[in-house]
Amino acid sequence: MNIYDLDLKGLTAQLTELGQPAFRARQIYAHLYKKLANDFAAMTDLPAALREQLTANLQIGSLELVREQTTDDGLTRKVLWRCPGDAVIETVLMIYPPDRATICVSTQAGCAMGCVFCATGKLGLLRNISSGEIMEQVLYFERYLRNEGAAIAKRHGGPVPDHITNLVFMGMGEPFANYERWWAAVERLNDKQGFNLGARNMTVSTVGLVKGIRQLADEALQVNLAVSLHAPNDQLRSELMPVNDRFDISDLMDAIRYYTDKTHRRVSFEYVLLDDKNDTPELAAQLASLVKGMLCHVNLIPWNPIPGTPLTRSHRERVTAFQRVVQAAGISCTVRVERGVEIAAACGQLAAIPSPTSPINLY
């Protein structure tokens, strides 16, 4: 059993079965999430007999590291993992000096949603991943920053964080299609006895599964919500995102209003810009009309290239023009800063395939 799949209560129960007192669970929990131990032998304040029991009955992690890639500036790093059963997932760390380090975490191997502009969607769903496999992605990069932060800072020529400050569930997969396991990881990440990352430092992105949006609104933890919108009308959104045939824009907006009314928290609308597809001033005006009056922010994303598609990204001038129309309606609207395009680590590029061997021509 992967020990990362156990919360403190579950770990306590497991140790009780091994004839151990409950306080040992708290000790082990601190080793895993505070000291970042990845070997029972390193837990030297535990009796040797207990360490032997742990080694015989539990394992620390189940992911196999296959490949690591880092951008030339050293500030974006992507890891490819092999899960038990041979499915693969990817995780990305993005460092924003001097004080922010964001990890982009996968919640499924592949994705069933089939968005036409996304590399992960072309894989189909391979399998859900466990809460422990989600945790393991985070702990790997927390350990990496703790051990390598000083070297990264020296290379960068200025301070960088030595720990993860923000987490986005925007990697491979649809988090709300794996809600139970995903939420178990969220609770463990937030647990003060565990990883102790504030809920407001976590953001989950969904294609628009309305049940999940409503369920998130009812949760006690205030995790931020981002919604992949990408079109302001049903005809175009269904063309880009098959999920719109199940939950149309009207259903989606009702769920989002429920979320904002219940939580009083702002929702981010993600809008990938595709040349001559969804980037016209007319569509910008439709988008502004759709979201006006909502507690929201619009995040425009110039599309990042993926193999095997005729799509192209919007030119800079069209991105700027689109943004101005939305802003003119009084709506907060920014353009996402690109990170990791050269190692296929940017938004929409995660597909667990080799990264480009030659530079990508963006325009």
UniProtKB/Swiss-Prot annotation:
Miscellaneous comment: Reaction proceeds by a ping-pong mechanism involving intermediate methylation of a conserved cysteine residue.
Gene3D superfamilies referenced in this protein's UniProt entry, alphabetically: 1.10.150.530, Aldolase class I
Subcellular locations according to the entry: Cytoplasm
Record CDD domains: Radical_SAM
SUPFAM superfamilies in the record: Radical SAM enzymes
Keyword DNA-binding carried by entry: no
Co-factor remark: Binds 1 [4Fe-4S] cluster. The cluster is coordinated with 3 cysteines and an exchangeable S-adenosyl-L-methionine.
Record protein name field: Probable dual-specificity RNA methyltransferase RlmN
Enzyme class of the recorded protein, top EC level: transferase
Keywords: 4Fe-4S, Cytoplasm, Disulfide bond, Iron, Iron-sulfur, Metal-binding, Methyltransferase, rRNA processing, S-adenosyl-L-methionine, Transferase, tRNA processing
Alphabetical list of HAMAP family matching this protein: RNA_methyltr_RlmN
Enzyme Commission number: 2.1.1.192
Domain Radical SAM core span(s) in chain numbering: 97-342
Cofactor(s) needed: [4Fe-4S] cluster
